[in-house]
Amino acid sequence: MVLVNAISEKDYIKDSRRRKKEEKEFEKLRKLLVEGLEDIVRDKKVLKAMFRVPRHRFVPEYEQRAAYTDRPLEIGHGQTISTPHTVALMCEILELSEGHKVLEIGTGSGYNAAVMAELVGKTGHIYSVERIEPLVNFARKNLEQMGYDNVTVLLENGSMGYPRYAPYDRIAVTCAAPTIPKALLEQLKPGGIMVIPVGDYSQELIRVKKDSNGNIYKKRKGEVIFVPMLGRHGFPRS
């Protein structure tokens, strides 16, 4: 029995050292990735948040080695985690600050929510809506393991938003809609900003600003590719 315990302890120490080495390697790769984003994103707060969030902890194990490449990765159920440069760009467009209350449509693995959580701080909160239950569970586990207690993941169809906690300072949509859903515009606080991809095969990232009088202003921010939004204000199921 003593011998078994000794071997187990030895294996534990060996495994612990291996994991620490891997984490250091991932940190180096993350640093290189963030440095590569500096030509796309100028907001230093966003870049720091991107460095603080370990992307490899938000993808399936078989994708971890590719976590710090600037490309989308599969997370199962026909869904993907967005490219790091897209996540950073959307966060920059949103102009996130301490204390903001944010609605996210499309949680995925929880990675985007984690980056936004870094930017809104402990006094802010992210309400993230996801329609696929296994991804809700995956995201909750990832966020809990990383200590993000300022993120709430909700099992809902996001095409209607989430009126319970409205209005929101910011709304981030990580799936492409045919048009900007009226429900989301209504849930955006005056002075608030929303970022949303619009279109089917050819999508554009749109920055939406609501002024203090409720007037809506839209600005195109470039071409993107996202999975489609499904539901009442999304695309029909194929």
Curated annotation (Swiss-Prot):
GO terms for cellular component: cytoplasm. InterPro entries: PCMT, SAM-dependent_MTases_sf. One of its GO terms (biological process) is protein modification process. CDD domains: AdoMet_MTases. Keywords: Cytoplasm, Methyltransferase, S-adenosyl-L-methionine, Transferase. The keyword S-adenosyl-L-methionine applies. The keyword tRNA processing does not apply. It catalyses: [protein]-L-isoaspartate + S-adenosyl-L-methionine = [protein]-L-isoaspartate alpha-methyl ester + S-adenosyl-L-homocysteine. It is found in: Cytoplasm. One of its GO terms (molecular function) is protein-L-isoaspartate (D-aspartate) O-methyltransferase activity. Pfam families: PCMT. The active site is at S82. Catalyzes the methyl esterification of L-isoaspartyl residues in peptides and proteins that result from spontaneous decomposition of normal L-aspartyl and L-asparaginyl residues. It plays a role in the repair and/or degradation of damaged proteins. This is Protein-L-isoaspartate O-methyltransferase 2. The lineage of its organism: Archaea, Methanobacteriati, Methanobacteriota, Stenosarchaea group, Methanomicrobia. The gene is pcm2.
